[in-house]
Amino acid sequence: MTKLHFVRHGKTEWNNQGRYQGANGDSPLLPESFEQIKALADYLRGISFAHAYVSPLKRARVTAQTLIKDLNEPIPLTIMPALREFNLGKMEGMTFTDVAKHFPQELHAFRHEPTAYDPRKIHGESFPQLINRAIPAIVATVAMDRTGTANLLYVSHGAALAAVIQSLLGTPLAEIRKDGGLTNSSVTILQADGPSLPFKLLNWNETSFLPEPPKPTDTI
């Protein structure tokens, strides 16, 4: 079976400030994130990864590069544009408080009712648009595993990964928040018997290896 390891990037300055950070916003990783990534590497040590794929956004690229360095393994790394975060439009860079004030309907739907989320007012990206760009790219990487036993690594973003992983599992759009969100520097593991969906969940949002228990705001 092919195993897919999905990692959310390390905690950033905007995460710490409570700002929305999508496909058009980026901020540096916090110093503490590098300790968390090292702990993640220790957790994953012993797994031989055939390939790693990463979002083009810098916070994800730095996470992936640091993780591979800490693993001390020559893992090929490919930038995959399909793994970028949601385009959050006008919400990019805004604080959680300001978004709740100016775009309450959009925020509620984005967080709690994905089927009702209409991002046209904020010039953002819908759940179907995100899923339709990401799923084919990920499935294609599984199809390239001729051995059928490879370990693959994907480094991406919280909101995007939560939606995409649930879609890979066959979860209806209305239920994609049923397992909650994903924490900075967490890993979620799926298993695939070839590229046909749905895949199988082995571990959701694993964080037991982190040096300190995550805060509620570290999960999205």
Regions found by a protein language model. Give the residues of each.
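Beta-strand elements within well-structured catalytic alpha/beta cores of enzymes
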Residues: K3-V7, T78, A150-S156
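GST superfamily/GST-like fold recognition
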Residues: G158-A162
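Short beta-strand scaffold positions
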Residues: V54-S55, N132, V155-S156
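Short glycine/proline- and acidic residue-enriched helix-loop micro-motifs
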Residues: H108-Q129
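Acidic, low-complexity terminal tails and accessory targeting/binding regions
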Residues: T2, E73, L88-D98, A143-A150, ...
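An N-terminal RHG(E/S)-centered segment typical of histidine phosphatases
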Residues: M1-F49, Q65, K69-E73, K101, ...
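Phosphate-coordination/substrate-recognition cap region in phosphate-metabolizing enzymes
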Residues: A39-H108
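Amphipathic, non-transmembrane alpha-helical scaffold segments
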Residues: F34, L57, A100, F127-I135
